[in-house]
Amino acid sequence: MRILNHLILPILLLPALAQCQRNNGEGDFVKNNYDKQEVYIPMRDGIRLYTVIYAPKDKTTPHPVLMERTPYGSGPYGDSIYRRSLGPNRTLMHELYIFVYQDVRGRYMSEGQFQEMTPARNDPHNANKKPDASGKQTDESSDAWDTIDWLVRNVKGNNGRVGIYGISYPGFFASASLPDAHPALKCVSPQAPVTDEFIGDDANHNGAFFLLDNFDFDNFFDIPRPTPVKNYSGHLFHADYNDAYQFFLDLGPLKNANNPGYFNNKGKIWNEYMAGSTYTGYWEARNIRPHLKNVRPATLIVGGWFDAEDMFGSLRTYEAIEQQTPNNDNHIIMGPWTHGGWAGGNWTRFGILDFGQNVNDYYHQVETAFYNHYLLPTDSAGLPEAMIFETGTNKWKTYDTWPPKEATPLKLLLQPNSRLTSPSTASAYTPPSPETTASPGYDEYVSDPAHPVPYIDGIHSGRDNQYIVTDQRFAAQRSDVRAYQTGPLSADLTVTGRLRPDIWLSTTGSDADLIVKLIDVYPDTGSNPGYQRLVRAEVFRCKFRNSYEKPEALIPGQPAEIAFNMNEIAHCFRKGHRIMVQLQSSWFPLVDLNPQTFVNIPTANASDFQKATIRIWHDAAHPSGITLPVMQ
C-alpha cells in the first residue's frame, strides 16, 4: 500500500518526487517533447475512468505505451499542467514512450465506486465482455483490458504494444492486469505489489494486525469520495502524537480506535479490516495469487530487502507465477531498498549500512532493458531469472532459479544457556554466565500487555522504517526477550532463501504472539562493534498455528509447535560474526497487542488483556530451532 506516517514521505509521492529531483536540470523537457491529453475511457459497464496520456510530439516512428493505474491520483490535472518527469525512469522518458496514468475506479477523477483490492473474477472473461456466474461484470483485470483496448485503437502513433508497472498499491493493479490479459499487453512489472493482506502484506502478517501502519494510512485513505475530485484533503481525524508507543498504549484495546475522536465508525476499510479477524472470504477474495495462472505477458517483479510494507508481495507474486505459469518469462530483482526506494536516482546507504555503490544504477539498466525488449521491441534483454543483492557482501548475484537450488537446509537448534547450535563454521559458544543447575528443558519470560516490547528503541512519532535493520541490543537486554546465539563464525556463511522457524511454545494464557528475529551479531572490535543487526523478523499469531480460517486456543501449560515460513534473505554472515535468534511475544505498536486470551481481538475489552508466562521449549521432545538455506 501503503504507508503514511509522520516522519517519511507517503510512498504514493516517492516516485514522482524522486524523478522530479533528479530531473531538475532538464527544465521543460516533458512539455517540449510531449503532448498531454486528458480523456475519460468507458469501461464495459458504462463507468468512465479518468486517464492522462503523454504522447511524444515526434511522429516519425510508432511508440509503445507504458501505463500506471493508481488510486493516488494521476495529476497534475489540467491540459496545460505537465509532470516534470514521466515513467519509471529518466532513460525511458528520453526514449519517448507514450506514458499513460489512470485513476482507478472510484478514486480521484474516475467514476464508479472504489473497493479495497477489488476481488478478481474467475478468468477468462475479458475478450467476450460477459458477466461471470454471479452477474458481476468488472474487476481490475477487465478495467485494464478495456483501457488497453481503447488506447491501442485511439491513441495516434502507438505501436500496438503496451506495458504496465506500479509500486505498492499501483503494484496490485499491475498484478491484476495479468489474468486473461489483453493481447497488446506484452509486459508487466508489479513492484512491491500488495498481494495478500492477511498473510504478509500491509494489514496483517500471519493474522497479526499491523496497527501503527494502518491507523495512519486508513486515516487519510479512507476519506469518502462521493463524487470525482482532483484533490483529497485532510484526514478522518486529527491524531498528532510524538511518542507512538505511549499513544497506542494509552489508546487501549483495538476497538477504541473507533471511539469518537478517531475513526468513529467512519472508516469503511478500517471497519472491513476489523470485521475480518480470521482468513475470511473478505481476505481470500482479495488474494490475487490464485489468479496468476496462464500468464502471457512477460513479468519483472521488483522488491526490497528492507521493504517494511510489501516485501511479501514481491516474493510471493514471483513464486505464484513460477508455480502456476512455469513457462512464463518471469524475472525477479531484489535489492537493499525500502518501499519504493528503487524509484529514486540515488541509493547508496540505509541507516548505518553503506552499500559502496549506487544500487539504483544497476536496477535502472535492468528495468530499461526489460521494457525496451518487449515494447519496442529490441534484441533479447539478456536478463537472468533472478537478480539478487546479497547483504553482508554488498554484491549483486544472479541465479537461474529463485530461491537458488544450490542452497541446502541447516537447522540451528535452541539450547540451554542461551546457546544456538553452531554450524561447522562456528567455534563453540561459551555463555557469559553459565548456569550451574540442570536445564529444565525450557526458558521462560513474562509477557505483559501493559509493558510490551517496543519494535524499535527510542521515541518515534510514526513508524520508523529503519527498524528493519536496527540494532537489537535494546531488546536483548529485556527480561521478556530470549536470545540464543552461536559462537564466532570461523568462515563466511551465506544464507540465501526462505527461513523457517519451528518453535515449541507454551503459555499460561490461551493465545500468544511469537516474534522471531534472525540477527547478525558483529564482533566487539572493528566497525559497528557489537551491533546486533536485524536481518529478518516476523510475527505469528499462535491461534492460527493450524488454520488461518479456524483459530484454536492454546491449552495452558501444553507445548504447541509454532512452525511457519518467513520471507527470504540473501545475507552473508561474515567470519567472526555470530548468528543470533531472538524470541518475544510483543512488537509494539508495529503490531497490535495480543490479549493472550482466546478472544476476538478487534472487540476485546481491557479486562481480556492478561499477563502470561511464556515458555520456549528446547528439550529432546521439543527441538525448537530455525532452518536456514545455506549456500555451499
Please place each PLM-identified region on the residue numbering.
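C-terminal, loop-rich substrate-recognition/catalytic regions characterized by aromatic stacking residues
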Residues: 239, 246-255, 349-632
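Accessory cap/linker subdomain of secreted extracellular hydrolases
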Residues: 82-85, 94, 116-130, 134-137, ...
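Glycine-rich nucleophile elbow surrounding the catalytic serine of serine-hydrolase chemistry
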Residues: 166-176
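Short beta-strand/loop motif that positions the catalytic acidic residue
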Residues: 295, 301-303
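Cap/lid segment of the alpha/beta-hydrolase catalytic domain
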Residues: 60-153, 343-355, 478, 510, ...
